Design a protein with these regions (language model features):
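Patatin-like phospholipase
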Residues: 1-38, 46-287
Length: 287
């Protein structure tokens, strides 16, 4: 079988769509040997590699009211739009345990994408033994510029991987993935507009990091180029793309009912396209 793998876009709480898709895939036992994720996609990636269907839903939806992990309340309390300590420490280590043992013993290659604030380039990171470093990488991958603190990984300041590489299909292809299954959190045809307000704030906050400012400035351009590449590969049958078929939620959506509907859409849509996705990936069922 040609090497197959998952490529997971981020998108804040839009990641519940991806969680719904992956939960159905995991229930069917479809674990591909490679997964790469960005931001919320990185969070989904580690739960996929640890074989924990339902965990992302628990963290993102079921504990939403109790955790108050997203929104202005979190920004005031923790100086981050998302409560990073809750998501990457309290949840995985106390409330909704992350299965580190299964993750570390898994033969799955799991790559997490962050943006190096010094270079403005993507860093593709992995960890197979150190629990704290794994969660620090996930935190860095999800640390949105301006509204979340910069995170140090191995002494290097990093922010959200989506700044430098929102959908790392090129990295997957470079790693030898011949059958990429890409899960996007935007509808077909979406193109990103320049984030002018974010750029203005970044120019004030990140004067020490000119390459990060440049990456933020050109993020929309590179994102749209990546969408063009994915659409071209899709049209030629070289990738299998899964994307929402209904209007998407905002990346800071914090209403449990809205998120549940979007999660359920991902889960039900996965049912509809499962045989096609499995056939494309060359997956023939659990051995």
């Amino acid at each position: 079988m040609k090497k197959a793998g998952m490529v997971l876009e981020g998108g804040g709480t839009r990641g519940v769509f991806t969680a719904g898709v992956l939960d159905y895939f995991m229930e069917q036992g479809m674990y591909l040997p490679y997964v790469i994720g960005v931001s919320a996609g990185a969070c989904n990636a580690v739960d996929y590699a640890s074989h924990q269907p339902g965990r992302m839903k628990l963290c993102t939806i079921d504990f939403l009211e109790a955790g108050s992990y997203v929104g202005l309340k979190s920004l005031v309390k923790t100086h981050s739009l998302f409560n990073m300590d809750l998501i990457f420490d309290i949840f995985p280590n106390k409330i909704i345990p992350f299965d580190y043992d299964t993750y570390f013993s898994s033969g799955m290659e799991c790559i997490l994408t962050a943006t190096n604030a010094l270079t403005g380039k993507a860093e593709y990171l992995s960890e197979k033994s150190d629990r704290q470093r794994l969660m620090t990488i996930c935190r860095a991958s999800s640390s949105l510029p301006v509204v979340s603190p910069i995170v140090d990984v191995d002494g290097i300041p990093m922010v959200d991987g989506g700044v430098a590489d929102s959908v790392p299909i090129r990295k997957a292809l470079h790693d030898g993935v011949k059958k990429p299954v890409i899960i996007l959190t935007r509808q077909a045809g979406y193109r990103k507009a320049p984030a002018k307000k974010t750029l203005k704030m970044a120019q004030i906050m990140y004067q020490k990091y000119p390459n990060l400012i440049r990456a933020i400035k050109y993020r929309a351009y590179y994102y749209n180029r990546t969408m063009e590449l994915i659409e071209d590969l899709e049209n030629r049958g070289h990738v299998f793309v899964i994307r929402p078929q209904v209007p998407v939620v905002k990346n800071t959506e914090n209403h449990a009912e809205v998120l549940t509907d979007f999660y359920n859409h991902g889960y039900e849509y996965a049912k509809d396209i499962f045989e096609q996705a499995a056939s494309f990936a060359g997956w023939e069922g659990e051995k």
